[in-house]
Design a protein with these regions (language model features):
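Long, solvent-exposed N-terminal ectodomains/accessory regions
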Residues: 19-184, 188-190
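Membrane-associated alpha-helical segments
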Residues: 314, 320-456
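Low-complexity, intrinsically disordered or signal/transmembrane-proximal segments
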Residues: 5-7
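Generic local-structure boundary detector
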Residues: 49-54, 155-161, 257-259, 282, ...
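Extended alpha-helical interaction modules
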Residues: 109-326
Length: 456
């Protein structure tokens, strides 16, 4: 026998094989990331143009109140809880926006001795991990915004634990309630993962953790400073509830070096312009629907013209015409207001599209070879092509309707004037007739008195 054959074990009487199917979920290690950070960029109107030039919005301070009271409490950050004391728009812990006129420096809202950025003391998480944090408060024209960042250093964690960066959903829009909307930027280095898109999906799902009524869905992807970036948006009509998230997964050592303060400034301006464009466009669509309703009500009044014409009584006809004229003029004024609002919205989108384009150009100038920022460019194209064009179409329709109803008002006025002249003429005729009758009666009375006197 061969040597190989001699080494073989003797045959067994019976061999039993048991196949165990191990599920992929057990074989595959759960996704993990390194050094994750979350940055909140909220955008909240400081001014209310409807209340007058440079008028402060009624709830302008609510952004700072929510960051201090809600987020500060959830993260147990004393610095964040005392945020009011660090802002120049507060005096004795009370909101005092007038102080911005004297103390505002390039839009920076933190008091000078706090520095440009307020560092938060290390926050101890339930698992005893340390969490760093900082906040940078800014006013961009008529809007309050901030860069509130929380991050882990030298930590590898399961993606499923990302909700630790969002306790009780305190960083989501339904908690922050920013009037113009917000963007959340989640940055991390992949550790254990399948694919980048799948990892990004899992990060969003874990971070939101069913705390958002309408979950943000994947919208686009690109590459920034050599690393893939994914965009998610819930696209709710209410800006204060709309959840916009960017997931940036480090795939290049140059990424962090390129994400400078200069880049962050341009990114904040770009996201602010984006939020304003989305907010104003949604508002413009609402105004247009209201204007359409007014136009519909005006169209329902047109058949009444013919009905009034059939009225036999001149006085009743005149009263009905005057009433109809008053109703049409009131609705025309309301329609004209909506047109003016739409024109203002169009101008606002124009201005912010220009600001967005400028910020995007600046970011592109900082980008590295291989970057792909088409998803940012597509939003600009959407604003310039769809949003602005839609408002132009709406305005043309409403202005054409305005012209039609203006002609109707002119016709009504003419009818009222004619009927008024006819009625006045008739009344003069009746007055003269009555006067003549009275003269005849007076003459007859004089004759009677004369004859009676003569007879006596």
């Amino acid at each position: 026998k061969s040597r190989l054959h001699k080494q073989c074990p003797p045959p067994r009487t019976k061999i039993e094989l048991t196949l165990c199917l191990i599920p992929d979920s057990i074989m595959q290690e759960p996704p993990q990331i390194k050094n994750p950070s979350i940055t909140l960029y909220p955008f909240h109107l400081r001014n209310d143009g409807d209340e007058g030039y440079d008028a402060v919005a009624k709830n302008a301070q609510s952004l700072w109140e929510n960051l201090a009271d809600n987020v500060g409490t959830q993260f147990n950050s004393n610095e964040l809880k005392s945020l009011r004391e660090k802002l120049i728009c507060y005096k004795d812990k009370q909101y005092y926006p007038d102080s911005e006129k004297e103390n505002l420096n390039n839009g920076k809202l933190l008091i000078p001795n706090s520095g440009e950025t307020l560092d938060l003391q290390l926050i101890t998480q339930p698992d005893l991990q340390k969490l760093d944090g900082s906040i940078y408060a800014l006013r961009i024209h008529d809007t309050y915004t901030a860069d509130l960042t929380f991050c882990y250093k030298n930590v590898t964690m399961k993606v499923a634990d990302l909700n630790q960066l969002n306790p009780q959903g305190c960083l989501l829009p339904n908690a922050i309630k920013p009037s113009l909307g917000q963007t959340l930027l989640l940055y991390a280095a992949p550790a254990v993962y399948d694919t980048y898109p799948k990892l990004a999906d899992e990060c969003v799902k874990a971070f939101v953790h069913n705390q958002q009524q309408a979950s943000p869905e994947f919208r686009a992807e690109g590459k920034l400073f050599g690393s893939p970036i994914f965009e998610y948006d819930s696209r709710e009509d209410d800006a204060a509830k709309r959840c916009h998230i960017l997931v940036w997964l480090q795939d290049n050592p140059q990424t962090l070096q390129s994400a400078t303060l200069t880049f962050n400034y341009y990114l904040m301006n770009l996201l602010c312009s984006r939020a304003k464009i989305v907010f104003v466009y949604r508002k413009a669509r609402k105004k247009y629907r209201e204007a359409q309703q007014i136009v519909g009500e005006l169209e329902e009044k047109l058949p009444e013209f013919g009905e009034v014409e059939k009225e036999q009584s001149q006085e009743v006809k005149l009263q009905k015409l005057k009433k109809l004229l008053a109703e049409v003029r009131t609705k025309m004024f309301a329609c004209a207001q909506q047109v003016r609002y739409l024109q203002e919205d169009r101008n606002t989108i124009d201005i912010n599209a220009e600001n967005y384009a400028e910020a995007l150009t600046r970011i592109k100038s900082l980008s590295i070879e291989g970057d792909n920022l088409d998803f940012l460019q597509r939003f600009l194209d959407l604003a310039e092509d769809k949003y602005q064009r839609q408002i132009e179409i709406d305005l043309k329709y409403l202005i054409a309707s305005q012209d039609l109803f203006q002609q109707s008002i002119s016709t009504l006025r003419g009818m009222v004037e004619i009927e008024q002249v006819e009625l006045d003429r008739e009344q003069v005729k009746l007055y003269k007739q009555k006067e003549d009758e009275e003269k005849i009666r007076d003459r007859q009375l004089e004759n009677i008195i004369f004859f009676v006197g003569t007879a006596i």
